């Protein structure tokens, strides 16, 4: 199970989320990215006004057809572009703990550091580590309030899909396949112990107990943003980690240089660096080998032929193949 903090744009929307124990994401690629990243059984808090609000468990996910006028949130139309954003992607939540705590607390240091290094709320959500979840589970008090019932007309749901063909794009039901979606699929793939064990074996890191590791999404550093960070969930004496950079296209020499900077910044406790891409030139492979960076090609199956696929189908088709 993972823990996410979800950014909320204004006080009114936060109150609606709290009143109905509901989270909603817009009909945009960032909205669908967040919806795909968060799974049933994960934990979330709302992020607004530099504070973390409450702790919830995700009970159900649904994508709603024709949700433009569906409560509780108002749709927004931007004058310059004429684009209207509404909230078809939704999470039904169960309340666990009630609190409103500043991110300057030590308990939220992992998330606060990401916010500071990114320069603010430029993302829809932030994944926190298990240490943050353990701390959040002890804040405030147990939720005892009854949630309000949301009265909505009968609606239909759909399963969103991704495609590499521009001709089949039809938001919010079919979106272009972007790098952030590949990153999310790989992170969830490596969150499964069997997959992670095979991956660690291939990169020559077999001293770590896969049952004590966690795979996290984007982690901000002074030198950039790590796409996927594998680290010990509860470090004891050592805080060992593995950094992964993900590219949908051809790997470049700049990607190797970026990973090398991450290795230098993280120091001796960074046990490995990995570059995952669609393809590699011989020159990039040689440079990676010289710097001790492992290289993998990803394979995705049906989506490569232009067929729209669901996020779960994407994960099922995903293969990581080591190349040298």
Where do the PLM segments sit?
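Charged, terminal alpha-helix-loop-beta segments
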Residues: 2-20, 39, 94-99, 112-324
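GIY-YIG nuclease signature motif recognition
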Residues: 6, 55-57
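Short coil-to-beta transition motif at edge beta-strands of beta-rich domains
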Residues: 34-47
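Short, charged beta-turn/beta-strand-edge "cap" motif at the junction between a beta-strand
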Residues: 47-53
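Short catalytic/ligand-binding loop motif for oxyanion handling, primarily in non-cytosolic enzymes
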Residues: 53-55, 65, 283-284
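Core residues of folded domains in eukaryotic genome-function proteins
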Residues: 54, 89, 240-242
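Aromatic- and Lys/Arg-enriched surface recognition patch
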Residues: 57-131
């Amino acid at each position: 199970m993972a823990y996410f903090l979800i950014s909320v744009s204004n006080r009114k929307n936060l109150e609606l989320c709290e009143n109905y124990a509901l989270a909603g994401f817009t009909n945009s690629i960032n909205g669908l990215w967040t919806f795909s990243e968060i799974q049933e059984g994960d934990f979330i808090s709302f992020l607004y006004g530099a504070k973390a609000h409450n702790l919830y468990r995700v009970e159900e996910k649904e994508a709603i057809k024709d949700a433009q006028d569906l409560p509780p949130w108002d749709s927004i139309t931007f004058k310059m572009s004429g684009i209207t954003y509404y909230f078809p992607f939704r999470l039904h939540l169960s309340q666990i703990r009630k609190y409103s705590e500043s991110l300057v607390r030590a308990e939220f240091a992992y998330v606060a550091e990401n916010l500071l290094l990114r320069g603010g709320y430029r993302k829809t959500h932030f994944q926190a580590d298990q240490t943050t979840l353990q701390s959040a589970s002890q804040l405030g008090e147990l939720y005892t309030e009854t949630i309000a019932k949301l009265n909505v007309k009968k609606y239909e749901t759909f399963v969103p899909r991704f495609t590499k063909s521009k001709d089949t794009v039809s938001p919010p039901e079919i979106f272009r396949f972007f790098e952030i979606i590949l990153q999310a699929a790989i992170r969830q793939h490596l969150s499964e112990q069997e997959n992670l064990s095979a991956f660690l074996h291939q990169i020559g890191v077999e001293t770590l107990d896969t049952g004590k590791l966690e795979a996290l999404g984007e982690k901000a550093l002074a030198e950039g943003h790590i796409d996927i960070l594998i680290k010990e969930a509860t470090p004891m004496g050592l805080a060992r980690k593995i950094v992964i950079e993900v590219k949908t296209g051809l790997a470049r020499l700049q990607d190797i240089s970026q990973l090398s900077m991450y290795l230098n910044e993280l120091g001796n406790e960074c046990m490995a660096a990995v570059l995952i891409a669609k393809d590699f030139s011989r020159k990039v492979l040689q440079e990676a080998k010289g710097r001790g960076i492992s290289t993998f090609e990803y394979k995705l199956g049906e989506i490569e032929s232009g067929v729209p696929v669901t996020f779960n189908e994407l994960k099922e088709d995903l293969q990581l193949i080591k190349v040298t």
